[in-house]
């Protein structure tokens, strides 16, 4: 599973997915099972029953749709209560990251929290400082929140299309010179849709597409991936390639599982090219956050980067260029939000909060 919260804001939440021959489960029940596992492990570690929970949430589960956004939070709250939590509190993830950063400050400053994960990019402009640490009510210190449903999985999708799926016929030509249908490749590059390609009806449809290809090697490779259910493996290799070139350089993607000797290369410049639109959308969301606050760009002291996708040099550089007077601070990409949620929980519940 990846970017599991993304399902909350989609129409898929009440739909079912096949988890074995003839066995189906609702996506919402997957979320419930995930939370139940977390609760069980946490209770075993703490040797106590946990009834209260602080859950992080993106600024927007769904872009530009307050009704669906509210439904997404309601679905997550339902899942939390279904596993036994009786008191459920939500906190914006970038606000949680700001609380983590605040623990290190020695003076008051304005920080733009940049939290780019797998499913969403979230931003908060927050006033932080040692004099604020013990305050539970921070409404006046939160100057703006904003976010966009574009992040790491969108990068992965573009990388897979441009590298791995290019070797399977994405943008290949047919006998008439026209490009082969792209929908199959879009589905193969979209994590939660990969399983749909394994449906027997869909597999038969793909077999009939053999004559759509001028070079049948692409069709053979595609059918091997579908019949041997290699879709998620390819997605993981595309993600690994993205990570490998995130700080520069070149990598090789081993696709021997499809065909011996099939090893396309991928480099940072290709990454820059294929994710440009996604990066620009994220940068625009950061700018909009500051605009909503009414604060001059020059007054921002710090950019606090957290979330796994901020490890991409091209993204962090693009964001830093927008705010040249601010220093860049990198938090724990995978734990800042969780640490901040713990801080918030300790302020809400005091001794009841579990370390």
Short names for language-model regions:
Residues 75-102, 115-125, 131-161, 165-166, ...:
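Small-residue (GG/TT-enriched) beta-loop-alpha framework at ligand/catalytic clefts
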Residues 39-53, 283-301:
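Phosphate/pyrophosphate-binding loops at sites that engage ATP/ADP/AMP, CoA/4′-phosphopantetheine
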Residues 128-257:
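Phosphate-binding glycine-rich/basic clefts of nucleotide- and phosphate-handling proteins
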Residues 83-91, 298, 317-343:
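Conserved phosphate-binding/catalytic loops in two-lobed NTP-binding clefts
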Residues 58, 113-122, 151-152, 238, ...:
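A short acidic Gly-Thr/Ser loop motif
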Residues 1-113, 132-135, 210, 214-264:
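Nucleotide/phosphate-binding catalytic cleft detector across ATP-hydrolyzing
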